[in-house]
């Protein structure tokens, strides 16, 4: 049971910052031709045409628990109906064969060539063991790769936000504008893929015992378009041959199915679906990890996923949710508009299911919240709708689900009615209470920690809001790629965050923050939270 602490008076204030109706990056980005001048950029550039054309890179994903590992890859569609296979084991000369399933890739996404996607699950993994594997592509086995499992009683994860390969489009590199065209002409994807690779290499050099990566979404940039060269660049990072990534569906991933082809997520549910897929969950070490597709605004379905996951893994010491949109962030472009659109609905659901930590992305800035829980009041429900052609969302207006009212997020100057409605929307989102705890180590808190990750590739950065919200404990924007390191045991959950300097060094940007559990029963006690939640708050 989470210990309830005395909470001091919280003065709620409306956030009245008006964001532009078209979200735009700043002039800041990570120029790989500069940061990589002495570390491989010339080779990456020389090989870019081949990289962009190779859609068959393998991706690794955590399995349903830490004894499993999931694989996914494309293979060219041929005359044979070979069953997808991964050969895996501790003896290179005697690998066990694991078979899986295959399906057709929508050829609108791949152009002239037809591909199949292949999904295989390997089972029986043990901690601290060296394995080897090969993958069959069109009947040919790939070179042998090494995969090492780490400790599970003390697990270490990298947490990253928005690699968004291709998002540097429009920036200037060596006098030329980076483009987001198809194939090798996508020079933005070339730039961002190199920086993504550099971030992973830097993080792993400092933390070679990482178990896996958690990505808070937007692996790639193009929205609702063919973008295989962006996935090819993302998956070309050398580290990913031996490093699973638990990805989240971001708004740039959401609108076509290639995400679901490239990533073989465990415990896929029918909840929270968009074209890219839906919610999923997995267990690792002492933690239950729940990944929600919050591009789908049906919170009742997300609640179903959380409850299903908790029922499947009731003994997990930690419950961690990953979402893309930052319902408690501090970035200028999203945190007080589309980022917080589900705040009033998700806050009580997270409280009621004893979630410990929520990992977010979307705003390309860094922030760490104070310990937060719901205020127990009834609030409105909000969402966005797809535009007429279904290729993106109408970001200019939030919809009040109960009344149907459209709320302009950037009212015209002098439109007092729209400004009043926007102010009311912001006021309604003051639906939280700040827990009265101090310091960077908290024990048995009632509240939840909300983290927002900056971009791991530096493909795009946003400004921070001019005024720091009262729920934010720390935040930064230094225009550098960043990552966090999570260390999780049975009784502690710690997070450290670093930026990567232009000379490739990892530099801390926040103090270590730790949540401790005292050894008392940490299973969900939903009575109090349920009493404060209205009957329809999760619909």
What is the predicted role of each segment?
Residues 116-122, 130-151, 172, 178-186, ...:
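Extended active-site neighborhood of metal-dependent phosphoesterases/phosphodiesterases
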Residues 32-35, 522-539:
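Ser/Thr/Gly/Pro-rich low-complexity, disordered linker/stalk segments of secreted
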Residues 2-23:
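Sec-dependent N-terminal signal peptides of Gram-positive bacterial secreted proteins and lipoproteins
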Residues 28-248, 254-275, 300-311, 337-353:
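Divalent metal-dependent phosphoesterase catalytic cores across multiple superfamilies
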Residues 159-161, 212-218, 245-251, 292-293, ...:
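Active-site neighborhood of phospho(di)ester-bond hydrolases with catalytic His/Asp-centered motifs
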Residues 217-220, 313-333:
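Short acidic, glycine-rich surface-loop motifs adjacent to enzyme active sites
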Residues 16-32, 539:
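Sec-dependent signal peptide cleavage junction
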Residues 165-169, 220-224, 251-257, 298-300, ...:
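Active-site environment of divalent metal-dependent phosphoester hydrolases
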């Amino acid at each position: 049971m989470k210990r309830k602490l005395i909470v001091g008076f919280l003065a709620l204030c409306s956030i009245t910052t008006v964001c532009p109706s078209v979200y735009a990056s700043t002039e800041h980005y990570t120029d790989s031709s500069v940061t990589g001048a002495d570390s491989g950029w010339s080779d990456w550039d020389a090989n870019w045409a081949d990289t962009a054309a190779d859609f068959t890179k393998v991706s690794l994903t955590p399995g349903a628990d830490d004894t499993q590992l999931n694989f996914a890859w494309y293979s060219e569609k041929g005359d044979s109906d070979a069953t997808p296979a991964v050969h895996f084991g501790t003896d290179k000369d005697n690998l066990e064969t694991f078979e899986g399933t295959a399906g057709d890739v929508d050829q609108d996404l791949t152009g002239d060539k037809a591909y199949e996607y292949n999904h295989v699950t390997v089972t029986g993994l043990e901690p601290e063991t060296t394995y080897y594997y090969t993958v069959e592509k069109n009947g040919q086995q790939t070179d042998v790769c090494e995969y090492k499992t780490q400790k599970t009683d003390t697990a270490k994860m990298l947490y990253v936000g928005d690699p968004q390969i291709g998002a540097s489009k429009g920036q200037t590199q060596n006098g030329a504008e980076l483009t987001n065209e198809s194939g090798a002409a996508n020079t933005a994807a070339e730039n961002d893929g190199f920086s993504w690779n550099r971030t992973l290499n830097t993080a792993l050099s400092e933390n070679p015992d990482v178990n896996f990566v958690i990505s808070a979404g937007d692996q790639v940039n193009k929205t609702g378009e063919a973008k295989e060269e962006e996935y090819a660049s993302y998956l070309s990072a050398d580290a990913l041959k031996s490093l699973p990534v638990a990805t989240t569906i971001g708004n740039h991933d959401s609108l076509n199915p290639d995400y679901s082809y490239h990533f073989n997520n465990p415990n896929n549910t029918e909840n929270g679906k968009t074209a890219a897929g839906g919610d999923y969950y997995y267990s690792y070490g002492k933690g239950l990890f729940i990944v929600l597709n919050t591009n789908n605004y049906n919170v009742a379905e997300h609640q179903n996923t959380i409850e299903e996951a908790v029922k499947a893994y009731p003994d997990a010491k930690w419950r961690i949710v990953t979402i893309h949109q930052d319902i408690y962030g501090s970035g200028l472009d999203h945190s007080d508009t589309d980022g917080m659109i589900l705040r009033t609905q998700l806050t009580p659901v997270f409280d009621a299911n004893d979630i410990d930590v929520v990992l977010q992305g979307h705003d390309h800035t860094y922030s760490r919240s104070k310990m937060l829980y719901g205020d127990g009041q009834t609030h409105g429900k909000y969402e966005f709708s797809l535009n007429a052609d279904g290729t993106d969302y109408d970001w200019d207006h939030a919809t009040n689900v109960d009344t149907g009212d459209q709320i302009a997020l950037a009212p015209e100057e002098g439109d007092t009615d729209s400004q009043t409605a926007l102010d009311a929307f912001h006021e309604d989102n003051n639906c939280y209470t700040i827990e009265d705890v101090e310091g960077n180590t908290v024990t048995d808190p009632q509240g939840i920690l909300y983290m927002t990750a900056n971009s791991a590739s530096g493909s795009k950065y946003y400004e921070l809001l001019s005024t720091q919200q009262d729920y934010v404990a720390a935040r930064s924007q230094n225009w550098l790629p960043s990552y966090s390191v999570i260390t999780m045991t049975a009784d502690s959950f710690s997070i450290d965050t670093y930026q990567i300097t232009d000379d490739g060094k990892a530099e801390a940007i926040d103090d270590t923050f730790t949540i401790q559990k005292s050894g008392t029963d940490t299973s969900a006690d939903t009575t109090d939270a349920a009493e404060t939640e209205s009957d329809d708050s999760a619909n």
